[in-house]
Amino acid sequence: MELQGRYAEIRKQGLGLIAISYDAPETLKKFADSRGITFPLIADPGSATIKRYGLFNDTVDPKSRTYGIPHPGTFILDRKGIVVSRFFEDAYQERYTASTILSTIGRGTPAGSMTASTAHLSMAASISDTTAAPGERLSLIADVTPARGMHVYAPGKHTYQVVRLELDPQPWLKVHPAAYPRFEIYHFKPLDERVEVFIKAFRLRRDVTLLATPPAAQQLSAMTTATITGALEYQACDDKVCFNPTRVPVSFTVKLRPLDRR
């Protein structure tokens, strides 16, 4: 179980971990014993707590075997029990990995990384997990530091090329929208323009999911690794000149593990 494999890392980050299920206590104990789970599993027969959190799945036919299965996801609570973050997917087959959650909330250490530099900036790119299974959601992160006097463009009301982490399409990969940090407004005096830019070091994050649909899962089952490729694309300017758009390749290889169907 992926969470058990990351339990030590979660504890190291000062966080605890519990899981709640509608299963009976004896069912959860059997499940935990068979998989060596050491963090607490809480039984919620009748789904009373699950319903209070609005996680009871009543969107399917009551006669379906999936009726009542909770919407799978993760809540991050503070010490007062207040929810400060939540991570949920539309499809029950898809899940955030623990490392993706940790990286999203600013905790944890990337599992794999690479560096690159150009005349305009330096970049350290990393991936949350180097081992994953179909259905798991991973984070690709680009920590970008513009060179002195340089800026690159944030999304906004302009026609310059926005800095972006573009990923090559694969039939077994779902690419999620990029997450951008806050930008600055820069006054480009030669044209008297005010545009959205990044001048200081910043982080881009783009999540991807290894698809668990039957066609994708079948394709992934014949592979031992999955390579995710793409590039950091940007246009940089200084206070006088805008340079040609530039593309910095990135590549990460993820070792594949099979789905646990027990």
Where is each model-derived feature located?
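Structural microenvironment flanking redox-active thiols in thiol-disulfide oxidoreductases
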Residues: 1-49
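Sec-exported extracytoplasmic/periplasmic mature domains
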Residues: 8-12, 33, 54-55, 82, ...
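Solvent-exposed coil/turn segments that connect beta secondary-structure elements
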Residues: 23, 46-47, 80, 170, ...
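Short, basic/aromatic recognition patches
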Residues: 54-64
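Thiol-/selenol-based redox modules, centered on thioredoxin-like
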Residues: 63-124
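Extracellular/lumen-exposed scaffold segments
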Residues: 102-262
